[in-house]
């Protein structure tokens, strides 16, 4: 394949999987604003709804490693195509939910599909964009923000004029169209062979060196912070800053709008400069912004600080993936990224519990202050790595 042909193919595949990620994230993020309507319609409690969403997240996290490992041993396409199919089924099931049981099934099936898609699609981009890996992963990661912005608007219209089920069938149809486009463009073979999961080897490889262990700890702290902030930020604004629900939602949407720009930019800067250096800067900016937001109350200042917070922490997503992939062996990128992201998502899932407990028995200021400290620790860990790396180069 000529260089031009490779670049054209890589660009088309970037478009296909990035749009797929954006659409599935749009579908996933519809659940949060539609949850009150779902609870009322199905006659379930908030606790039950929370357990169902937790099941979705657990299934998604658990599927990360095997999907990455199998995509290494077979091909990326062998996992991506079934992932599209499972996602189509999962979102279509939401359209016909008639009770709690079907709601659980739809959530679990969709979580499996998302887990099957997440790592192989990222690994595919890493395969295709060796010199511009950060930029490609940044464009891909921005799909989360596209989905978040779209979900906020669609959910508002849905609860006013339609049933909560209405948006999910169009999501399934869009994913089906993207799957067809992906199959039409794909040049990888589809292969199913007898294989085993070497999770012990993958984990030992990831933690073999202190630098790798420290990187995992730093980004686990980052994901812990994200889980705590994202899930409670609108509630924090309404309960402590006297924001209306509408104003809190609008302020929260700023995070996604900023992320849409910052993620590709951070990835591109990481390709040209130092990924760790950019990550440290982002962590420090987010830590300062998270501390400042607890002591201000004027809406305009909160919007400014919220935007700065987003600038800081949104840089972390493409850089975390790229740093893990940079250090992974060429035949084990999917497995390494899958195992690392399983750890990150586990930390992410603990974040909301931490904020909820601390806010209940103390206050949000202490909870968010603790998250800011986590970011400072993460930045310190990465800064030490950078200093040691520089010293090593000088010693040579």
Residue ranges and their predicted role:
Residues 273-323:
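C-terminal transmembrane helical hairpin of 12-TM major facilitator-type secondary transporters
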Residues 78-93, 277-292, 369:
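Structural signature of the two symmetry-related core transmembrane helices
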């Amino acid at each position: 394949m000529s260089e031009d042909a490779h670049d054209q193919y890589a660009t088309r595949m970037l478009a296909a999987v990035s749009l797929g990620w954006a659409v599935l994230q749009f579908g996933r993020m519809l659940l949060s604003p539609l949850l009150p309507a779902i609870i009322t319609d199905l006659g379930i409690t908030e606790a039950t709804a929370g357990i169902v969403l937790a099941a979705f997240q657990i299934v998604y996290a658990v599927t990360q490693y095997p999907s990455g490992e199998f995509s290494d041993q077979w091909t990326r396409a062998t996992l991506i195509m079934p992932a599209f199919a499972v996602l189509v089924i999962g979102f279509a099931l939401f359209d016909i939910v008639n009770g709690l049981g079907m709601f659980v099934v739809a959530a679990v099936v969709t979580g499996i599909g998302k887990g099957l898609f997440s790592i192989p699609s990222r690994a595919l981009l890493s395969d295709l964009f060796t010199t511009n890996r950060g930029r490609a992963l940044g464009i891909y990661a921005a799909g989360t923000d596209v989905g978040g912005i779209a979900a906020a608007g669609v959910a508002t219209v849905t609860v006013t004029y339609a049933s909560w089920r209405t948006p999910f069938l169009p999501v399934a149809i869009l994913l089906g169209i993207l799957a067809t486009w992906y199959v039409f463009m794909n040049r990888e073979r589809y292969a199913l062979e007898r294989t085993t999961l070497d999770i012990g080897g993958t984990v030992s490889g990831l933690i073999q060196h202190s630098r790798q262990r420290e990187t995992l700890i730093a980004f686990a702290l980052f994901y812990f912070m994200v889980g705590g902030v994202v899930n409670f930020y609108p509630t924090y604004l309404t309960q402590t800053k006297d924001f209306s629900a509408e104003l809190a939602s609008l302020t929260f949407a700023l995070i996604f709008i900023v992320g849409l720009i910052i993620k590709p930019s951070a990835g591109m800067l990481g390709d040209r400069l130092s990924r760790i250096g950019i990550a440290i800067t982002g962590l420090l900016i987010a830590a300062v912004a998270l501390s400042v937001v607890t002591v201000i109350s004027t809406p305009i200042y909160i919007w400014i600080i919220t935007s700065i917070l987003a600038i800081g922490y949104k840089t972390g997503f493409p850089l975390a993936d790229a740093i893990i992939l940079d250090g992974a062996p060429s035949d084990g990128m999917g497995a390494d990224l899958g195992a690392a992201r399983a750890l990150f998502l586990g930390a992410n899932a603990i974040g909301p519990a931490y904020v909820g407990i601390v806010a209940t028995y103390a206050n949000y200021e202490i909870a968010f202050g603790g998250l800011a400290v986590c970011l400072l620790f993460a930045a310190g860990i990465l800064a030490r790595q950078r200093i040691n790396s520089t010293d090593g180069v000088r010693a040579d």
